[in-house]
Amino acid sequence: MNTVKSQHCVGDIRKIKPLLKKAELLVRVNPWNGESVEEINRVIAAGADIIMLPMWKSAEEVKNFLDAVGGRCKTTLLLETREAVECLDEVLEQGGMNEIHIGLNDLHLSYGLTFMIELLSNGVVERLCRKMEEKGVPYGFGGIARLGSGDLPAERIIMEHYRLHSTRAILSRSFCNTEYVRDIKEINELFDKNMCQLREYEKLVEKCSKEELLKNKYEIQTAVEKIVKAKKEKKNGYR
C-alpha cells in the first residue's frame, strides 16, 4: 500500500513545541500495550497538547488510556477498527475523551472493503457521526486532499464534512507531498496556496442548502460504485 509511517520520537516533540504559536501539538502514540503508561507520561512531559490513541478495539483499552492521561492534556480516539465500531456505544457512555476521529483507511481494511470512501457511501460514517453528535463529542473523519485531486475529488468530501457536521479533518499527503517538493520555501508556498483555496471553497459550501448537500451524498454513492468496479476490474486483470 502507498502509505508512510513516520519514524518520530519523543525528542521531536521537544523540538517542535517551542515553534508553535497558535497550533496545538497532537501526538499519536502507539496502540495500547504494556508500555503505554510510560510512553504517555514521556509524551506529556515533552509537551504534547493532545494525545491520539490509534487501533483501539475495546472500551477497556479506551478507559485505560484515559486513566493514564488523567486529564493532563486533551485526548482524541482514532476509530479505525471494526471492533471499535462495535463497542462505540459503550465508549461514548463511558465518556471522558475530548474528540474522536474516524480513520477511513484502516477502517475500510478492517471491513474488507475495496475503497475507503465506501464507508461514506454505505452509511457507516454517517451512523458513527450521528452517535457522536448525539453525545456531544466533537468528531471528524478521513483526510482531505488538495482541491481537484483524489480518486474522489476533495470538494465532494468537504461537502460531506459539512453535511455530517464534522468539525475536524486530517490533511492527506497529496495536499502538500514532500516526496516531490523538497525546497522548504516552495513547500511553504504550496501549503499556503492549497490552504487558501480550501478556505475559499469552505465559504462556498457554508452557503449550500440541505438539498444540495444531500444531492452530493447521492452523487458520491454513484461515483464510489464506479470507482470500486474499476478497482476490482484492475485487480482481476480487466481493462
Label every model-predicted segment.
Residues 1-239:
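Expand to "…catalyze enediolate/carbanion chemistry for C-C bond making/breaking, isomerization
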